[in-house]
């Protein structure tokens, strides 16, 4: 039995190490290479539209980058002012390209500036939305360089729409009415009047475009960042790395749907009419020195008879991926699966219920930290019957430990006989040495799902808990190297070793508490019979303390509290079976009480 245990332990750690290596080689490594590779391929120019057909306009040539303020000031603008958004839209191209999210800050500091969402072309890393019309052999359609006239309104605000006009001088007059609600949705209604004296065929289009990708995006493998949309009845996603390297993939014929570009917490997405036939596509082209990424759709061609006009309505979402708001738009506007803009992942059947539970509890207690504690209790209750059997088996193992040691000593020269006698002892005492594995394995998907929820949902970003914890989605900000802030010194500033102290060796309060509760939990279990196993198990709390240190505080709260509940359950069972345990030993040392007889 000892040899089997040793072999199983070694196999476990070898497999775990192999999985980590494979993940590094086939996931992390290629992703890093894609980010670091120099993009030298030049995308072929878009093919000219055939007679009677329309396609998305070609990507523009990107001008040399200027400051954001200079890029905003370079074009005439209309101010945008809502309870959640501020910025402006450009009259050149009638683009929505300058937005800040006023209710979200870049850091947890009170004086931190608001999050910047969209930025105009000409600045570094522009990100904007544009809608309009395309058509073959139709001269004078307004493009990105067309300057519109503000015909009505002065500031775009809820209940205060603006109207823009553009006359191409060739018989077509374009009128654009733009509305915005008190959250994140713009409604754009385009009307085209035909006074050319002959029918004109054009098609509506829309594009969300990003030129270049900031270096801090696309590095988290668990989070989808890049192209996203619901087209042809399916969720379509292309990560930035693949998008830049391989292009965006095929065109999708769809009825309605939505598409755009997403980051971890933010989304810019176009929503065409939900009953209209559209062709959506994620496209990559190149301008000098930069990738041009755009998510675009083209609607069905519309023929406007002479003397008539047509109208087309497109909506544009630009804001934080707050699940209740996404669901409200999904229900009120009929936007299919709009809450899938949040990356629920392959374990969506766990991540969604976990988020809904946390959201429900949060409404009543006001903090997601306490909601995580409540979630932990619920998970423990679900696994209670199984865990109870596990801890009873562990307690029995600890109780028969002296007999096991005697058998090992008695038959140390006869491994076969030793194993036979140990198996007989397990059967006689109704002990299962493997009973402790199953509950832990069953909790791993829950742990991963909670990790996903904490990572991708905006509700967890900058969510405080207590004391020093101001962001449940970030690592513990304290560090042992300055005594958790008691010493006014930043370990990251230390010469040569600062990067290590602030990186792999960063240890905060919660990781240390987690490691201590893990050590105490393992101390409550019977010691391994093999010396190698004993050393491995002694090192595991230390190893996992460092492994867990970079994880989100919310995860550490969950796992540490789970360890505490495990200890309480295990302690009660051990007291019931009258088995001595480390907690009683610590209490006796602190109080000076003798060990009870028997």
From Swiss-Prot:
Assembly information from the UniProt record: Interacts with the Sec translocase complex via SecD. Specifically interacts with transmembrane segments of nascent integral membrane proteins during membrane integration.
Family named by the database record: Belongs to the OXA1/ALB3/YidC family. Type 1 subfamily.
Alphabetically ordered keywords of this record: Cell inner membrane, Cell membrane, Chaperone, Membrane, Protein transport, Transmembrane, Transmembrane helix, Transport
Biological source species: Phenylobacterium zucineum (strain HLK1)
Membrane topology: Multi-pass membrane protein
Gene3D superfamilies referenced in this protein's UniProt entry, alphabetically: 2.70.98.90
Keyword Chaperone applies: yes
Protein name per its UniProtKB record: Membrane protein insertase YidC
CDD domains linked to this entry: 5TM_YidC_Alb3 (cd20070), EcYidC-like_peri (cd19961)
UniProt cross-references to InterPro entries, sorted A to Z: Membr_insert_YidC, Membr_insert_YidC_N, YidC/ALB3/OXA1/COX18, YidC/Oxa/ALB_C, YidC_ALB_C, YidC_periplasmic_sf
Entry keyword annotation includes Cell inner membrane: yes
Sections of the chain in a coiled coil: none
Function: Required for the insertion and/or proper folding and/or complex formation of integral membrane proteins into the membrane. Involved in integration of membrane proteins that insert both dependently and independently of the Sec translocase complex, as well as at least some lipoproteins. Aids folding of multispanning membrane proteins.
Gene Ontology BP term (one): protein transport
SS bond list: none
Recorded superkingdom: Bacteria
Listed transmembrane segments: 10-30, 364-384, 434-454, 496-516, 539-559
GO MF annotation terms: membrane insertase activity
Location of this chain's protein in the cell: Cell inner membrane
GO cellular component, one term: plasma membrane
């Amino acid at each position: 039995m000892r040899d089997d245990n040793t072999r199983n332990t070694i196999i476990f750690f070898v497999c775990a190490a192999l999985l980590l290596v494979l993940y590094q080689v086939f996931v992390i490594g290629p992703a890093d290479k894609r980010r670091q590779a120099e993009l030298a391929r030049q995308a072929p120019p878009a093919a000219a539209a055939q007679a009677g057909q329309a396609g998305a306009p070609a990507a523009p040539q990107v001008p040399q980058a200027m400051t954001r303020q200079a890029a905003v000031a370079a074009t005439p603008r209309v101010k945008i002012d809502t309870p959640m958004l501020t910025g402006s839209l450009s009259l050149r191209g009638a683009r929505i390209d300058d937005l800040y999210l006023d209710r979200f800050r870049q850091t947890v500091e009170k004086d931190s500036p608001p999050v910047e969402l969209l930025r105009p072309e000409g600045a570094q890393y522009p990100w904007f939305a544009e809608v309009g019309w395309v058509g073959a052999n139709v001269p004078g359609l307004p493009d990105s360089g067309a300057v519109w006239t503000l015909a009505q309104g002065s500031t775009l605000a809820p209940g205060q729409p603006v109207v823009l006009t553009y006359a191409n001088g060739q018989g077509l007059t374009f009128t654009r009415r733009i509305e915005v609600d008190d959250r994140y949705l713009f409604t754009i209604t385009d009307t085209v009047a035909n006074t050319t004296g002959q029918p004109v065929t054009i098609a509506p289009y829309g594009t969300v475009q990003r030129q270049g990708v900031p270096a801090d995006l696309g590095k988290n493998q668990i989070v989808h960042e890049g192209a996203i949309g619901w087209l042809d009845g399916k969720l379509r996603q292309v990560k930035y790395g693949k998008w830049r390297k391989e292009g965006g993939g095929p065109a999708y014929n769809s009825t309605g749907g939505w598409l755009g570009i997403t980051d971890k917490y933010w989304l810019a997405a176009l929503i065409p009419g939900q009953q209209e036939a559209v062709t959506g596509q994620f496209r990559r082209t190149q301008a000098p020195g930069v990738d041009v990424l755009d998510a675009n759709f083209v609607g069905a061609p519309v023929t406007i008879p002479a003397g008539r006009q047509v109208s087309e309505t497109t909506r544009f979402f630009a804001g934080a991926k707050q699940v209740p708001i996404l669901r409200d738009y999904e229900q009120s506007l009929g936007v299919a699966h709009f809450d899938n803009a949040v990356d629920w992942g392959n374990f969506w059947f766990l991540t969604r219920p976990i988020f809904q539970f946390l959201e429900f509890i949060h409404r009543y207690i006001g903090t997601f930290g306490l909601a995580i504690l409540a979630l932990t209790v619920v998970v423990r209750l679900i696994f209670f019957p199984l865990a109870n059997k596990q801890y009873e088996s562990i307690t029995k193992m600890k109780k028969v430990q002296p007999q096991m040691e005697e058998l090992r000593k008695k038959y140390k020269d006869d491994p076969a006989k030793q194993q036979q006698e140990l198996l007989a002892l397990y059967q006689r005492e109704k002990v299962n040495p493997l009973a402790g594995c199953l509950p832990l394995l069953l909790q791993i998907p829950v742990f991963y799902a909670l990790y996903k929820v904490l990572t991708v949902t905006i509700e967890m970003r900058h969510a405080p808990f207590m004391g020093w914890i101001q962001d449940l989605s970030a690592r513990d900000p304290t560090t042992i190297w300055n005594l958790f802030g008691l010493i006014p010194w930043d370990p990251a500033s230390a010469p040569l070793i600062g990067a290590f102290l602030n990186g792999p060796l960063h240890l905060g309060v919660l990781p240390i508490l987690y490691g201590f509760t893990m050590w105490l939990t393992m101390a409550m279990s019977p010691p391994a019979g093999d010396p190698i196993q004993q050393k491995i198990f002694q090192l595991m709390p230390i190893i996992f303390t460092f492994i867990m240190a970079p994880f989100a505080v919310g995860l550490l709260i969950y796992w540490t509290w789970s360890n505490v509940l495990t200890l309480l359950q295990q302690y009660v069972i051990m007291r019931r079976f009258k088995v001595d345990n480390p907690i009683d030993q610590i209490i006796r040392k602190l109080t000076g009480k003798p060990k009870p007889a028997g």
